[in-house]
Amino acid sequence: MYEYINGLITNIYPAYLVIADRSGVGYKLFVANPYRFEQNVESHVYVEQIVRENEMTLYGFIDENEKYLFNKLLNVSGIGPKSALAILASDDAAGLVTAVANDDASYLTQFPGVGKKTAQQIVLDLKGKLDDLALSAGMTVETVPTTDNQALADALAALESLGYSAKDVAKLQTVLANQKDTTDGYIRSALKFLVK
């Protein structure tokens, strides 16, 4: 129902802020990180209204991209508004988009309230749906590079399945690309490198 509210931010609390519009009505907006806003400053805050059986709640966002990401997260099974705000509070939208693009569920578990199953669900539900956000926000998404060396590709896939992040695997590929080895040999070399 609401797209945004222009007004004076009158109060800032740990979980929400109050913004008064020009007619004097104060709106309580739950936000990911209220301290990104300044008190007693006219602001343009994007808003999402969520209506539940026994409550109507307004959620505020610093920009359209944050609101877009919030709505995408709400489409993930097991993610509600509070969980979505907790994820957004980390202020790592680029990391989230990159993790989804690279199927890196282990990276997503660093967000509050996101366990292994929820992280896998986020990747499953949002894969390919955040590309337009990355483009509009000017984010660069680091994807795991591919290789023609099948043994190396198998080793890298095995390392990812063991829970190593896509970022670590990409670094390993550059280190191991100059070697000729078997899949097992690549895995041993990679593990030695990771333990250092």
From Swiss-Prot:
GO terms for biological process: DNA recombination; DNA repair. This is Holliday junction branch migration complex subunit RuvA. Has three domains with a flexible linker between the domains II and III and assumes an 'L' shape. Domain III is highly mobile and contacts RuvB. It is found in: Cytoplasm. Residues 142-146 are annotated as: Flexible linker. The keyword Flavoprotein does not apply. The RuvA-RuvB-RuvC complex processes Holliday junction (HJ) DNA during genetic recombination and DNA repair, while the RuvA-RuvB complex plays an important role in the rescue of blocked DNA replication forks via replication fork reversal (RFR). RuvA specifically binds to HJ cruciform DNA, conferring on it an open structure. The RuvB hexamer acts as an ATP-dependent pump, pulling dsDNA into and through the RuvAB complex. HJ branch migration allows RuvC to scan DNA until it finds its consensus sequence, where it cleaves and resolves the cruciform DNA. Keywords: Cytoplasm, DNA damage, DNA recombination, DNA repair, DNA-binding. The keyword Ligase does not apply. Its main location: cytoplasm. Residues 63-141 are annotated as: Domain II. InterPro entries: DNA_helicase_Holl-junc_RuvA_I, Hlx-hairpin-Hlx_DNA-bd_motif, NA-bd_OB-fold, RuvA, RuvA_2-like, RuvA_C, RuvA_C_sf. One of its GO terms (cellular component) is Holliday junction resolvase complex. Residues 147-196 are annotated as: Domain III. It holds the Pfam family HHH_5.
